[in-house]
UniProtKB/Swiss-Prot annotation:
Residue ranges annotated as propeptide in the record: 197-208, 218-228
Protein name: Proenkephalin-A
Molecular function GO labels: opioid peptide activity; opioid receptor binding
Residue numbers carrying Phosphoserine: 252
GO biological process: chemical synaptic transmission; neuropeptide signaling pathway; sensory perception
Species of provenance: Cavia porcellus (Guinea pig)
Family stated for the protein in its record: Belongs to the opioid neuropeptide precursor family.
Pfam families: Opiods_neuropep (PF01160)
Length: 268
C-alpha cells in the first residue's frame, strides 16, 4: 500500500508537468504544420492541438499533421546540408574579401561563375603537370630538354662572331662536337654557311684586338658608292683644289691677318 501511495503521489506531482510538456510539444507540432502548409488557414490550430493531447476525437487533422511532419523531417537533413554549404561559401567569400580587398567584390561573381561552368576535378588538380603537357603537346618539356642545346648553340654563335677567346674555342671544338651536329640538324645547314675562311678570321682577330670589333666592317659604305656614282667624280676634282695639311700651314703663315679676322672661314 505504501508503494501505491508513493506512486500516486508521484503521478499527482508530475502530472501537470507532463501535461504541460505534452501541450507544448503538440502546440509546436501544429504550429510547424500550419507553417509548412501553403495556406495556413486550412489547418485548425486548436483542433490539431486538442487531437494531439487526446482531448478531442480524431478528425484526421492530427494524422495529416503527423504525415506532414515526417516528410519535413526527411527534407531537413538536405536543407541543413544546403544551409551549411551556403554558410561555408559566405565565410569563404568573406575571407577572400578581407584578403584581396575590393577585387573580389568586383570580379568575385565572374570567377565564381567560371568555376561553376568549368569545375576542376581533384584528379586534374593532382595531375596539373600532366594536363599541361597534354594541352601544350610537350612544348615546355621540349624547351626544358633543349636548354643545354641552346646554351651550346649560343657558344657556337659567339665563336662564329669572333667574340670568344681562343681557349674557349678550343674547348668548344673538343667538347661541343655533338652540339654542332645538333645545331646543324636543327637549323638544316643554315649555320654551316656562316663559317669563315682562316684568312678572314685572322683579319677579324686583328681588327678585334685593335678596334674592339667596332671597325670590323672593312670597305666603303654603300651610301658613299651611290654618292660617288651620282656626282661623277666632282668631289674628287674639288678635293684637288683644297690645300693639304702642309699647304694649309704655309697659307696660314702668308695671310695671318685673314686667319685672325675670319678664323679660317675664308681659307677656301
Amino acid at each position: 500500500m505504501a508503494r501505491l501511495l508513493r506512486l500516486c503521489t508521484w503521478l499527482v506531482a508530475l502530472g501537470p508537468g507532463l501535461l504541460a510538456t505534452v501541450q507544448a510539444e503538440c502546440s509546436q507540432d501544429c504550429a510547424a504544420c500550419s507553417y509548412r502548409l501553403v495556406r495556413p488557414g486550412d489547418l485548425n490550430f486548436l483542433a490539431c492541438t486538442l487531437e494531439c493531447e487526446g482531448q478531442l476525437p480524431s478528425l484526421k487533422i492530427w494524422e495529416t499533421c503527423k504525415d506532414l511532419l515526417q516528410v519535413s523531417k526527411q527534407e531537413l537533413p538536405q536543407e541543413g546540408a544546403s544551409s551549411l554549404r551556403e554558410s561555408g561559401k559566405q565565410d569563404e567569400s568573406h575571407l577572400l574579401s578581407k584578403k584581396y580587398g575590393g577585387f573580389m567584390k568586383r570580379y568575385g561573381g565572374f570567377m565564381k561563375k567560371v568555376d561553376e561552368l568549368y569545375p576542376v576535378e581533384p584528379e586534374e588538380e593532382a595531375n596539373g603537370g600532366e594536363i599541361l603537357t597534354k594541352r601544350y603537346g610537350g612544348f615546355m618539356k621540349k624547351d626544358a630538354e633543349d636548354g643545354d642545346a641552346l646554351a651550346n648553340s649560343s657558344d657556337l654563335l659567339k665563336e662564329l662572331l669572333g667574340t670568344g677567346d681562343d681557349r674557349d674555342r678550343e674547348n668548344h671544338h673538343q667538347e661541343g662536337g655533338d652540339s654542332d651536329e645538333g645545331v646543324s640538324k636543327r637549323y638544316g645547314g643554315f649555320m654551316r654557311g656562316l663559317k669563315r675562311s682562316p684568312q678572314v678570321e685572322d683579319e677579324a682577330k686583328e681588327l678585334q684586338k685593335r678596334y674592339g670589333g667596332f671597325m670590323r666592317r672593312v670597305g666603303r659604305p654603300e651610301w658613299w658608292m651611290d654618292y660617288q656614282k651620282r656626282y661623277g667624280g666632282f668631289l674628287k676634282r674639288f678635293a684637288e683644289f683644297l690645300p693639304s695639311d702642309e699647304e694649309g700651314e704655309s697659307y696660314s703663315k702668308e695671310v695671318p691677318e685673314m686667319e685672325k679676322r675670319y678664323g679660317g672661314f675664308m681659307r677656301f
